[in-house]
Curated annotation (Swiss-Prot):
HAMAP family referenced in this protein's UniProt entry, alphabetically: Ribosomal_eL14
The keyword Ribonucleoprotein appears for this protein: yes
Keywords carried by this UniProt record: Ribonucleoprotein, Ribosomal protein
InterPro entries tied to this protein: KOW, Rib_uL2_dom2, Ribosomal_eL14, Ribosomal_eL14_arc, Ribosomal_eL14_KOW, Translation_prot_SH3-like_sf
Protein name stated in the entry: Large ribosomal subunit protein eL14
GO cellular component: cytosolic large ribosomal subunit
CDD domains named in the record: KOW_RPL14 (cd06088)
Gene this chain is encoded by: rpl14e
GO molecular function: RNA binding; structural constituent of ribosome
Length: 82
C-alpha cells in the first residue's frame, strides 16, 4: 500500500463521498489529513480520517498546503483526472 503523503491521489472509502478520488494536500496529525477535489469533482477541501482513504500509486508534485488552483494545475500537467 502506498504511503499517505502530500500530493498522493486517494480514493475515499467511507462516507457519502465514497468512491470518489481526492488529493492529499496536508498532513494534520497521525490520524487526519487535508484533502481536496480541486473543483474537479464534488470533494471539497476538508479534514479526513486516514482510515477512510485508500491511497493510490499516483502522486503529483505539490507543496504542502497547496491551493486548489495549484492542485488543479499539477493534475493537468501530470495528465491525471479525478
Amino acid at each position: 500500500m502506498p504511503a499517505i503523503d502530500v500530493g498522493r491521489i486517494a480514493v475515499i472509502i467511507a462516507g457519502r463521498r465514497a468512491g470518489q478520488k481526492c488529493v492529499i494536500v496536508d498532513i494534520i496529525d497521525k490520524n487526519f489529513v487535508l484533502v481536496t477535489g480541486a473543483g474537479l469533482n464534488k470533494v471539497k477541501r476538508r479534514r479526513m480520517n486516514i482510515k477512510h482513504l485508500e491511497p493510490l500509486p499516483e502522486k503529483i508534485d505539490i507543496p504542502r498546503g497547496a491551493s486548489d488552483e495549484e492542485v488543479k494545475a499539477a493534475l493537468e500537467k501530470a495528465g491525471i483526472s479525478l
